[in-house]
Amino acid sequence: TEVERIKRLMSEAGLRISAQGVNQFTKNHAANRKVFDLAKRLGNRNISADPSEDSFDSLEKLVAEYNVRIAIHNHGPGARYDKIADVLKAIKGRDPRIGACADLGHYIRSAEDPVKAIRLFGDRLYGVHLKDFAEPKKDAKGVILGRGQLDVIAVYKALKQVNFPADGALSLEYEENEKNPIADVKACVAVALDAAAKA
């Protein structure tokens, strides 16, 4: 099957899938189950999600059945979960496997403190997107990690403080310089590695 082929290729490369998504979820339990089934078959513990309000009863049943986490992703200004408080409200009182995927760049764009987000989500943080923007506004320009608003060392210190899970999804995200991003991505990786060593 295609799933088995993907698993084989990942294994041969020494890689594992840490997350999938961002998935939309509704109250349609059968459709939601298909996403969880794929995650389980891929050996993935984390599904990044933008769930509708009416999806949470279904999601609670599925996270318990599959032991796969939901990590609510913030999409920036004007999105359903663009503020830290929006995600905290959504996960309050829910199964602890329903938590957050903090896209740090989008929190910058929403004028929220990315390090504060990590600390507030605490042990409900299952995904982090390392991304930086030049300024805290909706149409801000993306920049190489550490050259904008993101304090990368403080991010890693906060991740240590909240005991970010070893099987959580820590992703580097860079969307600029589409025609030739390799040098910029290498610079982002260097900053991330340096910050991790200093944290």
Which residues does each PLM region occupy?
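Histidine-acidic metal/acid-base catalytic patches
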Residues: 85-102, 108-199
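Active-site acidic/histidine proton-transfer and metal-coordination neighborhood
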Residues: 3, 9-99, 108-111, 120, ...
